């Protein structure tokens, strides 16, 4: 029998990638192409949607050619994508009306403030699980309607379509036959009712967005059409799985039960915890989001972001010059048994969940004459683990379920000193997978399950960790260290706020 493959399309913020998986979920090949970033004004970030489409098809053809795989040997395609990034295009010509507005773009912050002033915060929170923020798609759509000449009129006449990047890719792969998205991506638009599983008419009216723009929403694992015969040499390949990047990573890490969580240690951290088949309401400023829809079920997650994670290690390297490479942090941190009472609070851009203090600033506490660079390096690594515990504890309270295990990915997950301290601090196992491509793997699993290659039980069985870090710290020691962290955070908070007739700030 000929080998059959699953193709994962990973449409990210900085690149388009195509990853070929075999039936054992092993990577056969990867192709990647960087994307141009456009910054037309400070705080604005755009992509050329046509460049994304061209780059995505280019890497698909490259990975197939390099590895001698015929399109007909593809069992299915799965798609994962940068979330929230917004494009509007003409349904007849397929041409975008403007560059795509990227998730990081802040141009709609004033519009968000006006929505808050209109008293919409509670409605948005209760309906979508999100907070009003420029991050999400809704205000990006409204900006395009209001600021690109002729777009509002064309939208109201039904000539235009909206999509996040998954929708844009499927529409092009099917030559306009399918205008669809999945539950996970829809839940990031700030327009989707995550309880009723429908676009919310009240929010569409409040934002003055025509309903005709929006795609059909389908379960994450299922049918999203087939590729048009002209796309891949006559082959019609089922597009069978879609999930936003962070939800795809949660699936790729097989976090299928409430209380299972994944943390991606990148420049910042993205933490998601599976919270069950009912949405958990957060009292800590975490986001409630749809994890995925599969087998007639919808499952939910809580999401929290840490602003500064790997960026703190880069700071040690680039600004303080304490280390020559990020990898050196493990070597120096491992030369001391602990941080020697030192705490680094990397609040360079304020603090996110659960503190939400934009006036907090970075600080180092507990310095003595005996403090060496090894202690400061160790304390900086420890800060990633402390911030993760802050968010995980908030998730446990909000979801009403304790953490079962933390599965990790991203660059800093390779740091053994950090991973052991993370396990010690949380008091649960930290599991690191052998495949670091967990986002693409999640998309491949969703597609493979839809076409009958795997089931969720098989996926759970396949995701044996490469290494498990077991907690070995005494409870008293864990509590003592964490109390010190909380004290350090309290003293970092509110640093930049005006007080006593002047501005409290560091030079």
Curated annotation (Swiss-Prot):
Glycerol binds at residues 83-84, 135, 245-246. It comes from the Bacteria. Its EC number is 2.7.1.30. It is an enzyme of class 2 (transferase). One of its GO terms (cellular component) is cytosol. Pathway: Polyol metabolism; glycerol degradation via glycerol kinase pathway; sn-glycerol 3-phosphate from glycerol: step 1/1. It catalyses: glycerol + ATP = sn-glycerol 3-phosphate + ADP + H(+). GO terms for biological process: glycerol catabolic process; glycerol metabolic process; glycerol-3-phosphate metabolic process. GO terms for molecular function: ATP binding; glycerol kinase activity. Keywords: ATP-binding, Glycerol metabolism, Kinase, Nucleotide-binding, Transferase. It holds the Pfam family FGGY_C. InterPro entries: ATPase_NBD, Carb_kinase_FGGY, Carb_kinase_FGGY_CS, FGGY_C, FGGY_N, Glycerol_kin. ADP binds at residues 13, 17, 267, 310, 411, 415. The keyword Nucleotide-binding applies. ATP binds at residues 13-15, 267, 310, 314, 411. Sn-glycerol 3-phosphate binds at residues 13, 83-84, 135, 245. Inhibited by fructose 1,6-bisphosphate (FBP). Belongs to the FGGY kinase family. Key enzyme in the regulation of glycerol uptake and metabolism. Catalyzes the phosphorylation of glycerol to yield sn-glycerol 3-phosphate. This is Glycerol kinase. The lineage of its organism: Bacteria, Pseudomonadati, Pseudomonadota, Gammaproteobacteria, Chromatiales.
